[in-house]
Amino acid sequence: MVSHLKKTRKLRGHVSHGHGRVGKHRKGGCRGGRGKAGGMHHHRILMEKWHPGYYGKLGMRTFHLKKNPLHCPVVNIDKLWSLVSDATRQKYAEDKKKVPVIDVTKAGFFKVLGKGRLPNQPVVVKAKYFSKTAERRIVAVGGACVLTA
C-alpha cells in the first residue's frame, strides 16, 4: 500500500523509532565515542595510520640555553657590491649625483670588514659594526658608514 507519509511520521509515538531496544542508536556509545575520543585507546590504529606524530613529544625544550651573544656574521668590502644587482650598479655609475645605499643587515650580515678593494664609486653602507680598515676604505672612495641598531 502506497502512503504519502514518511516513515518518521508513522513512527511518532513509538519509543525506539525503529532502532531496537535499550541504548541502541543513542548517544556516543554506538560509534566509539564522540569527536577525538579513544585516539590513544580503541581508535589508536587509525590515529597512527592517518595522523602519525599526533601524540607524544618530540625534541627538547631548551630553557637553560641562551642564544650566542657573540654571533656576528661578517662581510668584506670586496663583496659589498654583490649584494646589489648589476642594473642598480650601472644606474648609479651613470648618475653621479645619487649614491646607492647598501644595508648589509637585510642580507644577514652584522659587521663589515676591510678585506679587498672597493671600486672607485661612492656608496653608503649601513651595518651594526665596522672595522677601522673598512671604514677608512669606504670613506676613501667618497662613501659613508652608517651605524644601525
UniProtKB/Swiss-Prot annotation:
Cross-referenced InterPro entries: Rbsml_uL15_N, Ribosomal_uL15, Ribosomal_uL15/eL18, Ribosomal_uL15/eL18_sf, Ribosomal_uL15_CS
Gene Ontology CC annotation, any one: cytosolic large ribosomal subunit
GO biological process, one term: translation
Signal peptide residue numbers: none
Spans annotated as Disordered: 1-38
Coiled coil region boundaries: none
Comp. bias intervals (Basic residues): 1-29
Pfam family, one: Ribosomal_L27A
Single GO MF annotation: structural constituent of ribosome
Keyword annotations from UniProtKB, A to Z: Ribonucleoprotein, Ribosomal protein
Parts of the chain that traverse the membrane: none
The keyword Ribosomal protein appears for this protein: yes
Family of the protein in this entry: Belongs to the universal ribosomal protein uL15 family.
Protein name in UniProt: Large ribosomal subunit protein uL15
Native source species: Tetrahymena thermophila
Lineage: Eukaryota, Sar, Alveolata, Ciliophora, Intramacronucleata
